[in-house]
């Protein structure tokens, strides 16, 4: 069982690429085969990296970007169906708290589709750049659900 937990951690971390260039930390959603759909583990990895950057004096800004042709398809529905963590200690809330409380410039470089959380997370960014062909959508609104 421990090896499964270790694999889950390292597999998730591999879906979030981290690169520091000078004083800028770039976090890249790197799951293009799934349109960068975000899993619980990816949320936790993002939260951890953003929280670390908040207290690192060598990092002056964070850029969130993506690989492939989509920024993100939103939440990975299969992952959330199998493990629906939604309390304040959940990875999703950890991520939202991290970006909401981040004391330095938070920048998003968006291309392709930004679905669900891919759109709502942008409201917490200080600057958002988007390609001209970027499509923003919040499908949960058509169900009468608004998370904000």
Feature map (PLM): residue ranges:
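Hydrophobic/aromatic residues within transmembrane alpha-helices
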Residues: 27, 64, 76, 121-123
């Amino acid at each position: 069982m421990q090896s499964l937990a270790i694999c889950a951690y390292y597999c998730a971390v591999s879906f979030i690429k981290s690169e520091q260039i000078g004083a800028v930390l770039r976090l890249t959603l790197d799951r293009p085969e799934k349109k960068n759909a975000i899993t619980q583990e990816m949320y936790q990895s993002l939260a951890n990296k953003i929280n670390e950057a908040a207290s690192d004096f060598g990092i002056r800004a964070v850029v969130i970007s993506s690989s492939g042709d989509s920024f993100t398809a939103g939440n990975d529905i299969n992952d959330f169906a199998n493990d629906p963590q939604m309390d304040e200690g959940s990875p999703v809330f950890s991520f939202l708290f991290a970006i909401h409380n981040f004391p330095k410039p938070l920048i998003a470089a968006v291309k392709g589709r930004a679905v669900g959380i891919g759109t709502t997370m942008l409201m917490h960014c200080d600057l958002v750049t988007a390609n001209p062909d970027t499509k923003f959508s919040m499908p949960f609104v058509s169900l009468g659900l608004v998370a904000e």
